[in-house]
Amino acid sequence: MKKFFLILILGLLLSNTSFAKRNITKSDFYNRIEEKGNMGFVLRYHNEKSPSGYEIVMPKNAPPIISDFKSKYGVLGGSRSDYGGTKFSAKHGGIDFYIKVGSPILAAADGKVYGVKVKDQCVGNQFAIDFGKSLDGKRMRVTHMHVGKIHVKKGDQVKRGQLIADAGALVKTNCGGGMEHLHFHMSKNKGSGGWGSFRFLGGPKGWLNPHEYWTGGKGKPECYVEGKEYPEGLLTLPVVCSEL
């Protein structure tokens, strides 16, 4: 009898573990969005707790983060070690925001576009902006990946809140993750070493955690509001918040 109960308990544990680690489907994702409301939460997988290092407080009307900085899991819950059919230890180098196809992508601060690439085999369309120095003196260079139409070109000066791109459709590549989203990747490195699709996983030197540089404080991103004054060296959300 003891042996029977031991086998039963082990079976239940294995079953629960298998369920917890399975990838959710796109349908599952939309169901969760509908149940919880599609604004203002950070979606977590596998009981992963604050991989960014901060408790994140999203505005109630902001699009959700579906894979956070340093997360081990992709936008649909799969392990990042499985990307491209390869096995390696990897953490997320940026923040993934779920946004609907065609939605506006905004400049997170004043800056200068220093890189543009379309139809990248890994991430689709992407571009990079130098937002200047942060309050702690680090250079804030941000790559925007998986986008649709890009409204800026290399060398353009941009203003905070300016329309810089449209959200792209589902990226049908090894790096798309199976869900449309904006990948917002921040680095202090210069030149080609500070941006590009090969920088979004792993652990290269120079990564910066965007959650340290929000205008609302660490872990407290704010929606851009036209006409409001913001301090230099800090970022507002690159995605549009809905009206409450």
Outline where the language-model segments fall.
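Sec/Tat signal peptide C-region and signal peptidase I cleavage site
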Residues: N16-A20
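Zn2+-dependent peptidoglycan hydrolase active-site motif and core
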Residues: H92, A107-K154, L170-H183
